[in-house]
UniProtKB/Swiss-Prot annotation:
This is Periplasmic nitrate reductase. Catalytic subunit of the periplasmic nitrate reductase complex NapAB. Receives electrons from NapB and catalyzes the reduction of nitrate to nitrite. GO terms for cellular component: membrane; nitrate reductase complex; periplasmic space. It is an enzyme of class 1 (oxidoreductase). Residues 1-29 form the signal peptide. Keywords: 4Fe-4S, Electron transport, Iron, Iron-sulfur, Metal-binding, Molybdenum, Nitrate assimilation, Oxidoreductase, Periplasm, Signal, Transport. Binds 1 [4Fe-4S] cluster. Binds 1 molybdenum-bis(molybdopterin guanine dinucleotide) (Mo-bis-MGD) cofactor per subunit. GO terms for molecular function: 4 iron, 4 sulfur cluster binding; electron transfer activity; iron ion binding; molybdenum ion binding; molybdopterin cofactor binding; nitrate reductase (cytochrome) activity. InterPro entries: Asp_de-COase-like_dom_sf, CT_Nitrate-R-NapA-like, MoPterin_dinucl-bd_dom, Mopterin_OxRdtase, Mopterin_OxRdtase_4Fe-4S_dom, MopterinOxRdtase_cofactor_BS, Periplasm_NO3_reductase_lsu, Prok_molybdopt-oxidoreductase. It comes from Campylobacter lari (strain RM2100 / D67 / ATCC BAA-1060). Its main location: periplasm.
Amino acid sequence: MNRRDFIKNTAIASACGVAGLSVPSSVLANTENKWRWDKAVCRFCGTGCGILVARQDGKIVAVKGDPAAPVNRGLNCIKGYFNAKIMYGEDRLVTPLLRVNAKGEFDKNGKFQQVSWQRAFDEMEKHFKKAYKEKGVEGIGIFASGQYTIQEGYAAAKLVKAGFRSNNIDPNARHCMASAVVGFMQTFGVDEPSGCYDDIELTDTIITWGANMAEMHPILWSRVSDRKLSNLDKVKIVNLSTFSNRTSHIADTEIIFKPNTDLAIWNYIAREIVYNHPEAMDKEFVEKHCIFTTGYADIGYGMRNNPNHPKFKASEKDTVAKQNSIILDDEEAVSLAYLGVKAGDKFEMKHQSAPDAHWEISFEDFKKALEPYTLDYVAKVAKGNEDESIEEFKKKLQELANLYIEKNRKVVSFWTMGFNQHTRGSWVNEQAYMVHFLLGKQAKPGSGAFSLTGQPSACGTAREVGTFSHRLPADMVVANPKHREISEKIWKVPAKTINPKPGAPYLKIMRDLEDGNIKFAWVQVNNPWQNTANANHWIAAAREMDNFIVVSDCYPGISAKVADLILPSAMIYEKWGAYGNAERRTQHWKQQVLPVGEAMSDTWQILEFAKRFKLKEVWGETKVDDKLTLPSILEEAKAMGYNEDDTLYDVLFANKEAKSFKANDPIAKGFDNSDVNGDERKIIGSDGKEFDGYGFFVQKYLWEEYRKFGLGHGHDLADFDTYHKVRGLRWPVVNGKETQWRFNTKFDYYAKKAAPNSDFAFYGAFAKELPKGDLIAPQTQEKYSLKNKAKIFFRPFMKAPERPSEEYPFWLCTGRVLEHWHSGTMTMRVPELFRAVPEALCYMNEDDAKKMQIAQGDIVWVESRRGKVKARVDFRGRNKPSKGLVYVPWFDENVYINKVTLDATCPLSNQTDFKKCAVKITKA
């Protein structure tokens, strides 16, 4: 086909698309006959949709849903169809950029100038080594990502934890899934869901809690909608939210509740079961498979515990002071009365250092703790729409409880950020399991509490790989000596290499930058300066402190703009990779095209940086803090055949085992691999020479080494080649068979192995020995085994630390919209998505707006005690807040809403609550 025919056929196809007509098959055939289609994975949310991508002339030219993909069955959401266009924005980063002065020297106050990869790594090396020498292993920090490929995350964690002996690496998944992780670990003793997406087609009831699935998980919502339409009378949908949204459109019931009162609603449902419908309780299931537990309530809110910190403005201090104590109001006093307190009391946060401590209690104590959560009390504290009558709200709560309680009704509870981004996010995750366990509706086809993931590999990379600051792969943790020993053996490094002290979580890395305790930070595959609450502090920390900030990215987002060095990163289909989705499904893809410009993969950047460090520079005796010094392991390294002049690259990534994975592997035939073979761009690498590849199949090596961590104990993954032949597999994968429902002996090999004569086995090993106590505290020193059992937690209702007041009368909630992904770094570069939603709006109640003489489309200030931004008001659109609440998405850097939000977190998970702070709205 010549150029004229190509243009003609393309024009016909475009015209037909605009007119809504089908395209003649002959035109499609002519247009596509030179395209190469291959399977891949969507770049966006945690749903894990399979897609087909087409390549022609070195570019991705088309994307469509993969009909063979079991997750999405050929459908894409609006973002998914633009997976190709995110790669070709006009301001794509194509070369390293360094801040320099007029002489070309690095200058933190200088302007960005193009530099070579060699110059970029020279500067990185210099500033890293300076920070490492001055501050030790805690003087550096890595902002990691739930958008890393699995291999990238594994390489990063291995370099930091085994190479640098630091645990200061933490992913942006800390912002989205950490509370879910704690909920899983504390309840089941192991991470990730027991169920799978198949539950949607098998259930009778879908209840969403703080999960606007219609916009945030639209493909799953299409499956929910299909299930609803299959049996309109039987299948029920309830949407619980702090504001009305698109998920309510097909819901049978919408329940609008006040922020944080989901805690009270769960306890109301549990009370209904225990007090009013004891026959609904699955006593056999509970007695065989569960124990009752509780923990401390006086744990703070994850803020700094010094309200007089010199970086705080005067307006911030009152809120921060609540980290140490609060004055109980009438409503909170009722929920905490079991602790012997009353309204007006000062409630001191005495257990800030032990937020995750918990112990076994009796069923009688559990029942006693639920007693205050009557329908009258919960309706009073939780009703979120002041225009709704209390009787109507009570009726909805009763209907909700009845749906859960109905004996033969299958129920799935879905949640996302409304639960997880919560100062008691771990608690509310535990409460969901509480109700499902009481009813015996967990780990069964069509029934279960199910945490939906936000990012494409928050499960596969952040959680399973262990890029969190306290974790190692396969649910292991750095504080456990047995886990360190296992990891050191797999990594082939000396004993005592791994630092036993957990590193700084994401927000603490920011605070340590502000305090001058971290001098070097490297950002990969995320945008922390846009996505972290109370952002004015962190902008100042990046620009005004003596530190060096490196950002690897594909576009110049806010984080890149505050950086000292920017590295251009390859995007998803410009590299080999794998993601793990919310239902434990792992999916791999091949590199389809070469990266643009001089961009290189994050794996390449990690390995090239590793070449800059000799063992003698990082494996000597190292002081961590006043209580911990890491011993020198150089002699042990020599005994293992290493030389002190070997680099971390030689030992960790280019060892004998790695080089056994041949570059000319048959699985790679016909596909580029820029990391392994170099490519036609002839990139001048970090050593100033042309990079012609590592010469071994590094991605396959990283995968096969990583999967060793999970084999044999319930985290089994298939081999590399298998994933390239299938549309993903749900782990554990045992004898080639995936697992749909964990802990159920009919479906889970490990459950059957743990308890061959039982229906269920909750075989997770974490925190499975507990003392016994009452509602106040543990009463025994001795710990008792909970082998194969899960925990039913009692957790009290507590309010958010900052609530509306006379000066700041509105709740602020943040989140996403359908058309954009996270901070908009990619999707705002897609013309069609930008035209659809060009700016973040301030959604507010129409009556509130009219009362303030604010019209549709007016520009207002959204202001908190921390900062303010301008936004355009909308009260006619997709989101309908009740009076007293506004909703502002965070994808738009021109509406920098995280300057306004509060950096309070769940103390157990360290996950930020982006959903609740107090603001005032004024005309701009």
